[in-house]
Amino acid sequence: MYVVISGEKGEGKTTELLRLCATHLKEKKTVVFLTTREDYDGFASTLEEMGAKDLKHYYRPMYAKDLQSAMEVAPIIAHGPYDVIALDGYSKLDDKQYEELMKLTNERGVIISTSQKYSN
């Protein structure tokens, strides 16, 4: 499953991304949430408001300040115990980087929030 949430800045992409993550968390699927936002701590309470429970067992937020940092941790995430990989704030991926990231997911669910349009 690959879901790309696209839109302009301020159109609620991250909120929609969190809503989809909450749906998976309610199903007791493990979610890793990789973001460029330093204030990601608040996302846990948002997920709980959306009905997600047991976050300490199923939810792992991670901060990577830029694309290079994200690509460095991507192999670690890909081999971790996660059912869903959510990416927030990495809108400068080109098609090749996007394709590489998809290969690293090992056929897990991927949700990307971005203002970028991809050809795949």
Per-range role (PLM):
Residues 1, 54, 75, 81:
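Short, basic/glycine-rich phosphate-binding loops at helix/coil junctions
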Residues 6, 86-87:
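A short, structure-level motif marking secondary-structure boundaries and short turns
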Residues 2-63, 67:
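Conserved P-loop
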Residues 30, 83-84:
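The start of beta-strands in P-loop NTPase/AAA+ ATPase cores
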